[in-house]
From Swiss-Prot:
Subunit structure: Monomer.
Subcellular location(s) of the protein: Cytoplasm
InterPro entries linked: G_OBG, GTP-bd, GTP-bd_Obg/CgtA, GTP1-OBG_CS, GTP1_OBG_dom, GTP1_OBG_dom_sf, OBG_GTPase, P-loop_NTPase
Cystine residue pairs: none
Protein name per its UniProtKB record: GTPase Obg
Entries under Pfam families matching the protein: GTP1_OBG, MMR_HSR1
Amino acid sequence: MKFVDEAKIKVDAGDGGNGCIGFRTEKYIPRGGPNGGDGGDGGDVYLQADENLNTLVDFRFVRFYDAERGENGQTRDCTGSRGKDKIIQVPVGTRCRDADTGEVLGDLTRDGQQLMVAKGGFHGLGNARFKSSTNRAPRQKTDGTPGEVRNLLLELLLLADVGMLGLPNAGKSTFIRSVSAAKPKVADYPFTTLVPNLGVVSMGYGRSFVIADIPGLIEGASDGAGLGARFLRHLERCRVLLHTIDLLPADGSDPAENALVIIAELKKHSPKLASKPRWLVFNKTDLLLEDEAELVIERVKEALEWDGPVYKVAAISKTGTDTLCRDVVEYLEELPAEFTPEEERQQVEFQWDDYHKTAIEELDDDSDDDDWSEDDEMMEVIYTKE
């Protein structure tokens, strides 16, 4: 199935049902009074995470989703039924933004988690709501309010513990093939990897972690060069990054300069992502003599002013991969188990959150009734005993 990690959709919450004007008319019950019922609220629109989905490709074909409208009120104080909510299934790891304002509505990181993205309209009020001692036969009602309409941007962020980044042909896909059962495409030309790949690394006795491989970065990726930097967002939820460096690049470039390019692109894309824990992994040590490899590694560390973890591996022969994976597992076990989204949900205000507080107040001054007029305020009634 085609991997799609971004989609735009439009959601339309249901309109609220209108209130009803009605009066009780039964034999032997004169002046029965108002009995018009309220309308029903419009249905809301929700996103729900589904662990059985792994792509947003379905949203390329269906882009509009709407909830049901609330039913109108009826006489005999009958309230209209509420509109049915619309629930849209999305993959676990989906982030939802308002496409017009850019605000983050929320992240769906657990199976079954729901997020309201559009609130249904508030129900209209029937004339029974407006009866009072001075307004015994009200002929006013309110209509239901329209449901919210939002343009949404859905972004799928892979849920992985470890993320790999580096230049094309650094050996990231080969590393994943050697430590997990994943089989991403491997070849001797740049950009063999076109979409992110996931692999599960098992160290036995229930100790495992998920590793993500994204397409390689090149200089200017943040400005759109190569495949761009948009795949970097899949690393935002990773807890540690493995910066893979090719000790003997096929194009003859300097490994130290290549490492600086990756760090520069990382900082341009997201300073928060650049501040994540990062380990250096020098790959293809089998292509150089040990002394030559050490010289290159020291030159890279000096250029980066690096004092963090350093690992030497040969992914194709699995040399050094077990040590690296074991250290990764131990590092992850020491971290807190709770997951904190990188970008917290912003405070989202829905259109009709406070409508019910003001709906009646706005109509309190309405004088359209049968029993009262402004002239009545100036009328003086004198009672005399005959």
